[in-house]
Swiss-Prot record:
Keyword Magnesium: yes
Quaternary structure, from the entry: Monomer.
Enzyme class per UniProt: transferase
Residues bound to substrate: T15, A16, S17, G18, K19, T20
UniProt-recorded name of the protein: tRNA dimethylallyltransferase
Protein's gene: miaA
The organism's taxonomic lineage, starting at the top: Bacteria, Pseudomonadati, Pseudomonadota, Gammaproteobacteria, Vibrionales
Catalytic reaction(s) noted: adenosine(37) in tRNA + dimethylallyl diphosphate = N(6)-dimethylallyladenosine(37) in tRNA + diphosphate
InterPro entries found in the cross-reference section: Dimethylallyltransferase (IPR039657), IPT (IPR018022), P-loop_NTPase (IPR027417)
Length: 313
């Protein structure tokens, strides 16, 4: 590892594991600036259901890449990488260490490994695709994508014309599918990265925390928050923002699917599944140091020792 490279810290972990609390403590003790690595916290007006840091927490530890988009907008992994690299560069220029905190593992992976260079947008091809969609409908365009790139078609909904159009455009420009191109790694992250994951030792503790968080969300006005989104004319259930756990289940409730208690139960179950996927991903992560959610002092000491060791080299 080249010690001339600037340092960066990754603080990963499943939902409800205590990442924000630990990050705030780190901000108090070290010259770090926080960057959110969370595909839900990017959205404005989605505060309660995403467990977004509150005003007091943000005063103690400002987070970059929070509240940058309207829920009607999409945000790609490539856009996150571009924005995060820009923020990291700015933090390093201030003589500080970027602390990236969140649970969107795909974002971390893209940062570490880079992304394959995709062809630039072509206005003529994009216009051609949009013209076809006007004639045939986006469902038919999605069927086209299924034929050429079933993996991308599985991820991209017919009601997401921005991403659907881009996937078709990439194929028509390059002759290669989005799936093929994204399997090619790009430029690696030019930083010395200290990678940590925080989680309780017992799975039951994660489940308890998730249930407690959901209960607090409901008491804090989560139903009203989702209702205000539901009443907008420009949002629908297939947008990435509304597919976030908790929001999807409440949206279904407003659509007449089951009772409020059903929605809460489904939301808790979906959040548990998310945490399980995050932990599974982290268990296969290389060069990762695990921290115990129930021992914050020990976690702080572990990170401090790592930083002190690097500074002494």
């Amino acid at each position: 590892m080249n010690k001339a490279l600037p340092q960066a810290i990754f603080l990963m972990g499943p939902t409800a594991s205590g990442k924000t609390d630990l990050a705030i403590q780190l901000r108090k003790r070290f010259p770090v600036e926080l960057i959110s690595v969370d595909s839900a916290l990017i959205y404005k007006g989605m505060d309660i259901g995403t467990a977004k840091p509150n005003e007091t927490e943000l005063l103690q530890a400002p987070h970059r890449l929070i509240d940058i988009l309207d829920p009607a907008e999409s945000y790609s992994v490539a856009e996150f990488r571009r924005d995060a690299l820009k923020e990291m560069e700015d933090i390093v220029a201030q003589g500080k260490i970027p602390l990236l905190v969140g649970g969107t593992m795909l974002y971390y992976k893209a940062l570490l490994e880079g992304l394959s260079p995709l062809p630039a947008a072509d206005a003529d091809i994009r216009a051609q695709i949009e013209q076809e969609a006007e004639t045939l409908g986006w469902e038919a365009m999605h069927d086209q994508l299924k034929e050429i790139d079933p993996v991308s078609a599985e991820r991209i909904h017919p009601n997401d014309p921005q991403r659907l159009s881009r996937a078709l455009e990439v194929f028509r420009i390059s002759g290669k599918t989005l799936t093929e191109l994204t399997q090619v790694k790009g430029d690696a992250l030019p930083y010395q990265v200290h990678q940590f994951a925080i989680a309780p030792k017992e799975r039951a503790e994660i489940h308890r925390r998730i249930e407690l968080r959901f209960d607090n969300m409901m008491k804090g006005g989560f139903e009203e928050e989702v209702r205000s989104l539901y009443e907008r004319d420009d949002l629908h259930a297939d947008l990435p923002s509304i597919r976030c756990v908790g929001y999807r289940q409440m949206w279904e409730y407003f659509d007449g699917e089951g009772t409020l208690d059903d929605a809460i139960f489904r939301g808790i179950c979906a959040t548990r599944q998310l945490a399980k996927r995050q932990i599974t991903w982290l268990r296969s992560w290389k060069d990762l140091t695990w921290l115990d959610s129930d021992n914050i002092d020990g976690a702080l000491q572990t990170i401090s020792d790592r930083l002190d060791k690097k500074q002494a080299q």
